[in-house]
Design a protein with these regions (language model features):
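Active-site neighborhoods and metal-handling regions in enzymes and metal-associated proteins
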Residues: 1-391
């Protein structure tokens, strides 16, 4: 996996005339270096983060790593490529990066970066004397698209950990339980089962009875999702839209289901699930290598009677890997031309998450992860829809 990822990055760098990548994003650093590290609060992922520098003519990346307790010590990166941490939010850290790049990057070599801190922007002319850096997404995005067998295995393991932890949380649902209690139980069990990091603040959102009764303003006038978990106590009959993600060895799970406190589901709510299932089945029927994002979006819209079965500020589906949501993102404001021109390769992974809504039901949303194959797909998600489904 380490060697394959490096080869893909360097081949794409050669194609685009890029001498060096400077990577700050956690997911990009994981992909380029194989490094993973424990993290409980995803909101602190920018604190003491590693930085990677990938050179087009070096088979190993350089990693500037704060080796905290519990960090992955089984690095495939050679010892002479592992350096003390850089704190690029500060001028001192940027000065150290400037010296490192001067030593590593050939004079005049083009550099691409995935993000720039304020301190990096102030020193941009010194950091990148050959000219403004290009966007590293043009290299990292295509490299990450097709998953290796090892990467699929890591994502599958992350999903199994997530599902086992989620099952314990679902069994604990009862009136009087707080949303934060659910988060605590999930995170504790996930780490006991071998999770490396907690990727997002767990969502156990209690859905309003109508679109306009949620008391949260949105620019689209539609449902607000996600809302932060609080100490709110659950009530009998509450409909919860759930969304959680952890990593295993740097690769993400993505879990979403709709639950009901008390497990009593009305006929209208069962009907919501059945329509959601029809939409998912229609999308899966056209999912295979060679299909496009547009094919899946049109199948979903047709199955939903001509309207989009996803929230306007989100998407019908997205990729997954070292980030919980990666390209492609289907049905966004990138537009129909983007969707129709994005062709699925075999080995790509996709998270499908259609949404159906009818006032008075709490709606229905779930997530399904698949691997694209030449003639269809292989399912990764393995979790029941209970209490929904009449059969």
């Amino acid at each position: 996996m380490y060697r394959e990822c490096g080869d893909r990055l360097r081949n794409l760098m050669r194609d685009r005339g890029i001498a060096a990548l400077v990577l700050l994003g956690n997911g990009n650093v994981v992909y380029a270096t194989g490094v993973s590290w424990p993290l409980l609060d995803a909101g602190l992922s920018h604190v003491e983060r590693p930085v990677a520098v990938v050179l087009v003519d070096d088979p190993h990346p350089h990693v500037f790593m704060p080796l905290r307790e519990g960090s992955n010590s089984h690095l495939e990166v050679p010892a002479d490529h592992v350096h003390p941490p850089l704190y690029l939010e500060f001028d001192e850290g940027v000065e150290r990066l400037e010296r490192a790049l001067a030593d590593l990057v050939p004079a005049g070599g083009a550099v691409a970066v995935d993000e720039l801190t304020g301190a990096m922007r102030r020193a941009q002319a010194r950091l990148f004397p050959a000219g403004p850096p290009s966007d590293a997404a043009q290299v990292v995005g295509p490299a990450k698209l097709v998953k290796t067998p090892d990467q699929v295995s890591c994502i599958r393991k992350a999903c199994r950990i997530t599902e086992e932890a989620a099952a314990e949380v679902q069994r604990s649902l009862a009136p009087g339980v707080r949303q934060v209690d659910l988060s605590a139980a999930f995170v504790r069990r996930a780490f006991e089962l071998g999770a490396t990091a907690n990727m997002l603040e767990a969502i156990w959102q209690v859905m309003p009875t109508t679109r306009v009764s949620g008391n949260v303003w949105t620019t689209t006038g539609d449902l607000a999702l996600p809302l932060l978990t609080t100490e709110r106590e659950l009530l009998d009959g509450d409909v919860l839209w759930t969304d959680v993600s952890i990593t295993y060895q740097g690769y993400c799970s993505d879990f979403g289901r709709t639950w009901v406190v008390g497990d009593r589901v009305t006929d209208r709510q069962h009907a919501q699930f059945e329509r959601w299932r029809e939409i998912l089945d229609a999308v899966l029927a056209v999912t295979k290598a060679g299909a496009t994002c547009g094919d899946l979006a049109r199948a979903a819209i047709a199955a939903n009677g001509g309207t989009k079965p996803w929230l306007p500020h989100f998407y019908l589906g997205h990729g997954i890997g070292t980030n919980a949501a990666e390209m492609p993102m289907i049905g966004t404001d990138l537009g129909a031309e983007f969707d129709d021109n994005f062709v699925f390769p075999a080995g790509m992974m996709l998270v499908l998450e259609p949404v159906v809504w009818e006032d008075g039901t709490g709606g229905y949303r779930s997530e399904e992860i698949v691997v694209i194959t030449d003639d269809g797909y292989q399912s990764i998600t393995d979790y029941p829809y209970a209490p929904y489904g009449r059969n």
